[in-house]
Amino acid sequence: MPLPVPPLLRPPLHRVRALCRPPVRALMNLRELVSALNDFASPALAESWDNVGLLVEPSPPHTVNTLFLTNDLTEEVMEEAVQKKADLILSYHPPIFTPLKRVTWKTWKERLVVRALENRIGIYSPHTAYDAIPHGVNNWLTKGLGACTSAPLHPSTAPSSPAGGTHRVEFCADAEHLDAVLSKIRDIPEVFSLTTLPARVEGEEQTRVSLNCSQKALLEVVALLSQNSLLYHKTEILLLQKPLLPHTGMGRLCTLSEAVSLSDIIGRIKAHLQLPHVRVAVGAGRTLESPVKKAALCAGSGSSVLKGTEADLYLTGEMSHHDVLDAVANGISVILCEHSNTERGFLSELRDALAVHLQNKINIIVSEKDRDPLQVA
């Protein structure tokens, strides 16, 4: 007969329950979370016309336990977010794009803002910033083509340039003119990074002057230097350009490892996007069995991004009728999948990437109600 366990050796009941519970996730302050989201994809990478970042903010302090991901924030999706107790909605498309003159119950977009604030839910939108990043929507879409290498169609530039200004001016001056010229240049607004270095020009000791300036200041600098022909004829003007960011930008030009038929590509895209149907326009002189080696793609609406690109295939969500005609006339086949169908599938990959980026501090869920408004009847 086994001996009874002394009461003091039994673990307390509350400790047993604690050991059985899943780990409790830490909350994140909204502004801390927004900063982390901006680190994941800088809003500076978004197109200039876009409206990205934190769009709706409940009064602080606001903590986030559940981040809710959706492609489009409709009223049905908002109701789902409320029911699932979301604290922040990340909506790929910005629900506020055109400025609101009032916030009432009259229009559906106004109602989204009202419901968000009533339920203390923030709204954040990354949109074209996620199009540009190397681990973003367009790179996800390339996976539907099969094995390939890709590069941005329109590379992004660095958000800011440390040098300042738009132009660099360089000239050489002798000791007789140097001090007077430098004094006048320093009086010109928007002149940056003025430096001097010893230089030897045609056997004479001179000083090489270098400065950065704005477009407006450039006119004044040139006017000043033109007063002295010796200085002016030794002047060089360079247009400063921001460096390109590797693997970052709008659209992708993909080169497949092996050419495959258009028919096979259609099957791959349908499988990747989990769609029963897509729309196809076969390029002039091509057939469904024609080989595809190069494909240009752009998630969403790709007309402006794809236009003029040499490829065997354009892949996007939607294009205008006339842009499709133009592509087909140039022997380029077109696959259209409807706008958001080329974006929505990325959300599952995004959920996993953000979980790692945010160190699993919060719950991240993907909407089950979000869907493309267009269906094949």
Identify the role of each PLM range:
Residues P2-A377:
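Hydrophobic structural segments
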